[in-house]
Structures are given as C-alpha cells and as structure tokens.
C-alpha cells in the first residue's frame, strides 16, 4: 500500500545490472543482464528484452541501484514464451553488501510460483534499505527475467 501523499517510482531503470553467467551462442544478445531493467515488460525472450543465465548451478541476477534506497517491493515479469516454471523458488534479496555476490543480503521475498509471462509484485515484510537487489535461484535451472522493477515510495509532487 502506497502511503497517502506518496507515489511509487521504479529506480532500477537507472541502475547497472549484472548476472552470474550469461547464455552464450546465437541468443547471447537477447540474454544480457541489462535487458531486465530496460523498462520493457515484453516477456518473449526472442524479442530481446529478457535476461537469461547459462545453465550453471545457483544462478543470480543483480542490479546496483548506484545509491541506497528504502525499497518497499520488487515487481518481476516472468518469461512468457516458455519455461515460466523455472523461476519457482527464486529469492529476492536486498542489501548493501556484495559478499557472495549479494545473495546473502536480507530476504525481501521468495517467488513461490509465477505463470508464464506473468508480472507480479513481491512486497517486502517491511521497507528494506539497500543498494543491491539480487534475484537468486538455488537450483540448477536457468534464471531468466524479463523485467525487474525496484519500487520506492517518493513524496508526490504538489
């Protein structure tokens, strides 16, 4: 719930994204970490607006917001052309540390399941302070995200 007199802003679009390992080969350009913060919720991987890890164990994706924010929720758009079940069990962690690539930062939420192509908002139990937002998948599945929006409450313009 957005407090009265406030509006919500996605600060991820100004950040810098990276991931554990990028898919290689003919679809490498479609797989870049920055695709998930381009402001485009297109969920078809082949349209070039999603990210895709290579098939290594425990893949992660991270956005550096370039400054510290108080984060209320994270909105994720799941891949829509196939494989939507792969995201099940992914963790959303938020914090100020890069140790272990940020996967040990405090947990905002766990993605139980998402439909293929679904956009869903995950609310942190309380506002969280952090610079790094990490989506970590503790399996050997590929991690693909079509959009990640990091939501902060800002005072509304008068």
From Swiss-Prot:
Question: Which residues make up the binding site for Ca(2+)?
Answer: 35, 38, 40, 49, 146-147
Where is the segment annotated F5/8 type C-like? Answer: 16-148
Q: Which domain of life is it from?
A: Eukaryota
Motif Cell attachment site: list the residue ranges.
79-81
Disulfide cross-links? 50-146, 82-83, 108-124
Binding-site list for alpha-L-fucose = 52, 79, 86
GO BP annotations of the record are: regulation of cellular defense response; regulation of complement activation, lectin pathway; regulation of innate immune response
Q: Name one GO molecular function term.
A: calcium ion binding
Q: Which keywords, in A-to-Z order, does the entry hold?
A: Calcium, Disulfide bond, Lectin, Metal-binding, Secreted
Task: Kindly indicate where the leader peptide sits in this chain.
Answer: none
Q: Name one GO cellular component term.
A: extracellular region
**Disulfide bond listed as a keyword:** yes
Where does the protein end up?
A: Secreted
Quote the function comment for this protein.
Answer: Acts as a defensive agent. Recognizes blood group fucosylated oligosaccharides including A, B, H and Lewis B-type antigens. Does not recognize Lewis A antigen and has low affinity for monovalent haptens.
* Additional comment: Binds 1 calcium ion per monomer.
Query: What family does the database annotate?
Result: Belongs to the fucolectin family.
Q: How does it assemble?
A: Homotrimer.
For this entry, the protein name equals: Fucolectin
- The organism is Anguilla anguilla (European freshwater eel)
Classification from the root reads:
Eukaryota, Metazoa, Chordata, Craniata, Vertebrata
């Amino acid at each position: 719930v957005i407090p009265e007199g406030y509006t919500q802003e996605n600060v991820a679009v100004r950040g810098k994204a990276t991931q554990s390992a990028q898919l290689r080969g003919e679809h490498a350009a479609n797989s870049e970490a920055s695709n998930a913060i381009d402001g485009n919720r297109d969920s078809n991987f082949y349209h070039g607006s999603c990210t895709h890890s290579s098939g290594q164990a425990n893949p992660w994706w991270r956005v550096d917001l370039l400054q510290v924010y108080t984060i209320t929720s994270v909105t994720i758009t799941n891949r829509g052309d196939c494989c939507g079940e792969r995201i099940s069990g992914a963790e959303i962690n938020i914090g100020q540390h890069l140790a272990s690539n940020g996967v040990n930062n405090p947990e905002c939420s766990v993605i139980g399941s998402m439909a293929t192509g679904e956009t869903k908002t995950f609310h942190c139990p309380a506002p969280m302070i952090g610079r790094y937002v990490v989506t970590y998948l503790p399996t050997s599945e590929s991690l693909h995200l079509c959009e990640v929006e990091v939501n902060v409450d800002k005072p509304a313009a008068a």
